[in-house]
């Protein structure tokens, strides 16, 4: 019995789900980053492979504006049903708009999904067990969404900025004398 069939029988996959991997071609900081080689494979290949290996998704889709990225994505098993329009491919377009565009495209093509997962093309260390664990937590919690996070390596309550006068100014001066272990733990999205 295949892993996918076994998971469906266990109740993990009772609804339709899609994975959307946004991958713009015009990165300014690291040009062509989504297809740069990382340990012998294009960076985006790792995200596609982990999505496929998890067996959580009915479709793994790459939303891109770039023909070369599209070609690489298809080579590694993703679906690229369109090239993203220019107005959704600039430096100011957020992930939400890209995901919504893809979901609208799918809906207009007669496909609707109960669950949508976004994996960034720049996540080569993501492990499928965390995708499965996150999906199970989402389904069992009744929440509308879930995301990965990590604890901050230091207390954010002790952070400061450098003023225009080149002086340190704490964001929360009331915490200056507190011990770091007495401050509440904070998290950031990962």
List each model region and its residues.
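N-terminal glycine-rich phosphate-binding loop and ensuing alpha1 helix
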Residues: 13-63
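Short, high-confidence coil segments that cap the C-terminus of an alpha-helix
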Residues: 57, 111-113, 142-143
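Short amphipathic alpha-helices and their capping/turn segments at secondary-structure boundaries
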Residues: 2-16
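Short phosphate-binding loop-to-helix
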Residues: 61, 67-117, 125-126, 133
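Residue-level signal for alpha-helix termini/capping positions
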Residues: 52, 107-108, 139
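Conserved core of the sugar-phosphate nucleotidyltransferase
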Residues: 97, 101, 123-190
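Structural beta-sheet core signal
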Residues: 19, 62, 118, 145-148
């Amino acid at each position: 019995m295949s892993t996918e069939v076994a998971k469906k029988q266990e109740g993990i996959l009772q609804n339709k789900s899609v994975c959307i991997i946004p991958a713009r071609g015009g990165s300014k900081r690291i040009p062509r980053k989504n297809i740069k080689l990382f340990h012998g494979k294009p960076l985006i290949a790792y995200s596609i492979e982990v999505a496929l290996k998890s067996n959580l998704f009915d479709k793994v889709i790459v939303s891109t504006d770039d023909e070369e990225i599209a070609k690489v994505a298809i080579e590694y098993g993703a679906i690229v049903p369109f090239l993203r329009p220019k107005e959704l491919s600039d430096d100011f377009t957020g992930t939400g708009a890209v995901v919504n565009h893809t979901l609208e495209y799918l809906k207009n093509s007669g496909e609707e999904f109960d669950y949508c997962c976004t994996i960034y093309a720049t996540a080569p260390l993501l492990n499928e067990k965390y995708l499965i664990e996150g999906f199970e937590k989402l389904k069992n919690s009744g929440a509308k969404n879930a995301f990965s996070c990590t604890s901050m390596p230091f207390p954010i309550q002790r952070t400061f900025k450098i003023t225009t006068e080149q002086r340190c100014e704490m964001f929360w001066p009331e915490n200056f004398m507190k011990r770091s272990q007495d401050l509440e733990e904070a998290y950031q999205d990962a």
